[in-house]
Amino acid sequence: MLKDILRKTTQSDLYRYENIVKKINDLERVMKPLTNEELRAKTLGFRKSIEDGQSIDNILPEAFGLVREASLRILGLRHYDVQLIGGCILHDSKIAEMKTGEGKTLVAILPAYLNALSGKSVHIVTVNEYLAKRDSLSVGRVLSFLGLSVGLILADMNREERQENYKCDVIYTTNSELGFDYLRDNLVGNPSEKVQNGFEFAIIDEVDSVLIDEARTPLIISRSLETLNNIYLTAKNVAQAFEINTHYEIDKRNRNVYLNESGSKLAEKLLGVSSIYKFETGTYILNAIKAKEFYTKDKDYLVMRNQITIVDEFTGRILKGRRWGDGLHQAIEAKEGVTVGSETMTMASITYQNFFLFYKKLSGMTGTALTEAKEFKKIYNLSVDCVPINKKVNRIDKEDVVYKSLYAKWKAVLYESLSIHEQGRPLLIGTSNVKNSEIVSGLLKEYNIKHSLLNAKPENAANESEIIAQAGRKGSVTIATNMAGRGTDILLGGNPDFLTKGELRYIFRSIVLSLDDMTVPKNELINNLKYKYVISEKNRLDVEELIDKLKSAYTVPEKNRIGVEELIENIDESFQPVDKFEILIQKLYEKTKERYVRECLAEKEEVIQLGGLHIIGTEKHDSRRIDNQLRGRAGRQGDPGSSKFFLSFEDRLIEIFTTGGLKNMIKELDLEDDQPVEGKIVSLSIESAQKRIEDKNYQVRKQLFNYDNVLNLQRKVIYDERDRFLSLTDFKGLILQYLEKLVDDVVAEMERSENQEDKSRGIVLFCKKFICLPYSIDPELLSNLSKEEIKIFLNDQVKISYELKEIELESLRVGLSQSLEYAFLLQSIDQVWKEQLTRMELLKESIGWRAYGQRDPLLEYQKEAYRIFAIQTRKIRHSASHLIMCSTSFA
């Protein structure tokens, strides 16, 4: 049903988009004769039209046509009709599903240009910094050529650099930088320290990775707390003494641990305590067991430089700076014997689900979105449209084969690899984690098969783009962990641009090394280069000239070295050299690339004849999307290719999630260990298991979204109030308002006491201790006053006291009262919000128990959250009032 609805919706929209594309194509003859200056002038004309009230939808055909022409002139790349359709989908605030190799990067600049014309910034969001930097320096030049400013936000930028880049028309950055900048902006002490300028339109590349896969992991800014590290080591020792099913049970599906009575008694005996729960030791022990049972080195994390580094299960990359919460990270540190880090207190947090909903307009691109169409619509109100492919997919996806044991599976993977390699076909082997990638690498080494290994380990990840770019060469073998967000196409025959830049870098670095020893003959260097790269005689003179030039020009080697490395990274046919040295580099680039283009085209034809790129999958992922991303690397742009998955009944997904019927069938067949099972029944059973996991994960994300929505409403109230503090120039009115509400709260609290004397004494104590009145009040004065009279009396006293406070502070230094009030207001709201985040986390963890009382946990959470928040907002007023009134003594 859902597929039919999606198909009909996509089809009706497709007719509309095709009509727009026809208009764009008709305008091409108008754009062609225009000079570069005339093309740029169009941008000013569009902006004027928008200022005069014209809708950007009306100028879409002409704007897209302009970008297409500029792209052809600057990059030598002309948008296909299907790419124009992709641009229309993005402009309509939808998700464009585009297959691998269909040019998503080029598509994004179409709606980015159009929407930036209105003067509001467009954020193009990528999953890693390499892609953000690459795209801003490549396709970003088209936008710059047309007169738009292009910004780039990277992790190592300071505040001033961020502020400058966020002012640009189009900004390339990562999802994590956007989220953390938002959180940091809401912790600043001065509005001038903020870096972001609002959320207008975001185009998210690999949108499924950001909005689906990372939805469960909140962005958190925290500060360290003092930690008793020995408690984690003690818990680890206790966990090691336990045996599974004797002292505890585990739930593999949900990664939960249950300590039974035997385990509790043993723990209490080992620790010498009466109850592990009474002393909160139970939580530490449960985490230690989770670390032992569910978290595996080189799969879930790496040990690097005495630290635990998390590996992203979806992309295979390390997550720098991320830590598991609730003491789990410390438990894993204790397990691995590295330094146990401090526990942290959350200062600010947000999920991507709620962060990206800030944008007035949101869209995204990916090769795999339809499987999650329901979630995109439900959570983000984003429809998914499939972009027609430019050329028919020519890939053969073979049936999955399943072996009884892991040993038999790896043996089959090896034999398949040897067979494909003997044919000369390029081979890409996908693995689910670092550990498995190294198993395959070890097997290939045994047979002396040269290969490239790409996983989360820094020594392997450093040359990621080059490894992927050359994975389509004849006879190449590449092992890679999950392929999501790799961002580089695999071109059959090799990528001439990467090969050219690789050769230039090698030449340059070799020359730099030779500068330390000026006696190294040029011929020896040239011969070394010939060994590494095929340096033609045509290039020989250029290389010799470059050696002489470098040896004479190096006055500040380190600075020049960095500059030349960046020059090589960014150079292309449209590069404009500014001196003789750059002219030489440009000349060398053009000649070298010309050679590689010829070689790669010739090699591509050979690889096509052999059958193209072959994909081997070594395990099915929980999500079908990740499997499809791996498959999608073969068969791009009409090229031939094939894929095949090799599985085992000992694989996690099959072992835990497939039905008993499949396992019983295998037992009845009584197969040999190396005899595989294949066919529709097996594939359907595995796919059914994946669908169940996907649905379960969707329910988890949906629940997280529902719970985080409650916190998000509170976050909005707090951040709006904080922004109000930042924008005020005079705090007197606000402080008096806070003091009046404080009096109301105190009087209401005292009214609960039935004893008049207790009421009077309580109010006097409040005046003395909480608001630090500089004089005493006689309780007898209050004994005969009504509630309203007490309020009037106290408000008068508080106001007089506040006025005296201001006079005293101003006498010490002009402006001191304003400075202190500003600081105390921010201190109060920040401290209370930190406490609230901790309270809400504890509430979320405990609220599930209410289900046993036949109550809806979410509804209970909403009620309790509202009650706690009401108390905390009062606490902001009380805390700020107390700090301001008691900042110095009147004595």
Curated annotation (Swiss-Prot):
GO BP term (any one): protein import
Lineage: Eukaryota, Haptista, Haptophyta, Pavlovales, Pavlovaceae
Subcellular location: Plastid, Chloroplast stroma; Plastid, Chloroplast thylakoid membrane
A Gene Ontology cellular-component term: chloroplast thylakoid membrane
Superkingdom to which the source organism belongs: Eukaryota
Annotated family: Belongs to the SecA family.
EC number: 7.4.2.8
Keyword ATP-binding among record annotations: yes
Catalysed reactions, as listed in the record: ATP + H2O + cellular proteinSide 1 = ADP + phosphate + cellular proteinSide 2
Membrane topology listed for this record: Peripheral membrane protein
Name the record gives this protein: Protein translocase subunit SecA
Function in brief: Has a central role in coupling the hydrolysis of ATP to the transfer of proteins across the thylakoid membrane.
Binding site for ATP: 83, 101-105, 489
GO molecular function, one term: ATP binding
Keyword tags: ATP-binding, Chloroplast, Membrane, Nucleotide-binding, Plastid, Protein transport, Thylakoid, Translocase, Translocation, Transport
Gene3D superfamilies in UniProt: Helical scaffold and wing domains of SecA, P-loop containing nucleotide triphosphate hydrolases, SecA, preprotein cross-linking domain
Metal-binding keyword on record: no
